[in-house]
Amino acid sequence: NMQTKEFIYDQHQKHLDYLNRLEFYTEEIAILKERLSEVTLKNTDKEVLKQVEHFQNQFIIQRNNIDELKHTIKIHENELQMVVAKNSTAVEHRKVIVDDKTQAFMSYFEQNFNELRKEFNLFLRDWM
């Protein structure tokens, strides 16, 4: 089992990038939820409210995914910091195993989120 390795610094940069992106999605969910409330105020139709509930649930799920990702990334960051704390020159030359799982979860999350956003925008077009 050949595991890919990368420099500690590169992994750290990747983590920062993920956290920035997750921050962006967190803000975006807040905005989408506001739009959803507007729809609820304008429409009392049962069909619409069923869809509203669907999106509410989706936003909760995606928020949980974000929290889970952030948590995982922070654990990895702590592990990196421990390696560096033990040996401060490790940053320059030490390689660590590439964190494929987080990378995969991240792209899976982003794909899902973009699909959801598309679906939601179509819904808004119909009901706003």
Give the positions of each predicted feature.
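Charge-rich amphipathic alpha-helical interaction elements
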Residues: 2-128
